[in-house]
């Protein structure tokens, strides 16, 4: 199948290494995950090879799929304050959250010499967030 962008959003390990290579060979230049870990390890290796060779974009679920969790948190906040936000208000808040995630992930990747590598950037940004929280609470 030919596509420019693939959005695997169904199940874990939905795309294996051979399928990832086929996507790339057929012109796909971006995979943005909408499910929890829809690409297996071999697929991720294929994405990384394509990123290095041709600038392929791969946004892992841990960053790209954060929108569902964010909207759930917004809903809980809205409910606890007995508020009722419009679609536009929720969408605006979500866009801000997702832009912030992208900024943190891309900044972390660049800061540590992995510009364009959103897997490494997401891992580093996530680690920094947890480490900062532990330091702030005096756990380290």
What function would you assign to each model-found segment?
Residues 21:
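Histidine/acidic residue-rich metal-binding segments in metalloenzymes
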């Amino acid at each position: 199948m030919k596509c420019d962008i693939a959005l695997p959003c169904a199940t874990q390990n939905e795309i294996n290494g051979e399928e990832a290579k086929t996507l790339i060979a057929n012109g796909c230049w971006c995979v943005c995950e909408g499910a929890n870990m829809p690409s297996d390890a071999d697929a991720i290796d294929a994405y990384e090879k394509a990123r290095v060779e041709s600038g392929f974009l791969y946004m892992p679920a841990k960053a790209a799929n954060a929108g569902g969790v964010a909207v759930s948190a917004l809903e809980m906040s809205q409910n606890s304050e007995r508020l009722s936000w419009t679609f536009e208000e929720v969408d605006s808040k979500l866009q801000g959250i997702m832009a912030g995630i992208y900024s943190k992930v891309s900044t972390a990747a660049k800061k540590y010499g992995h510009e364009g590598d959103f897997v490494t950037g997401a891992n580093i940004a996530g680690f920094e967030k947890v480490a900062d929280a532990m330091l702030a609470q005096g756990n380290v």
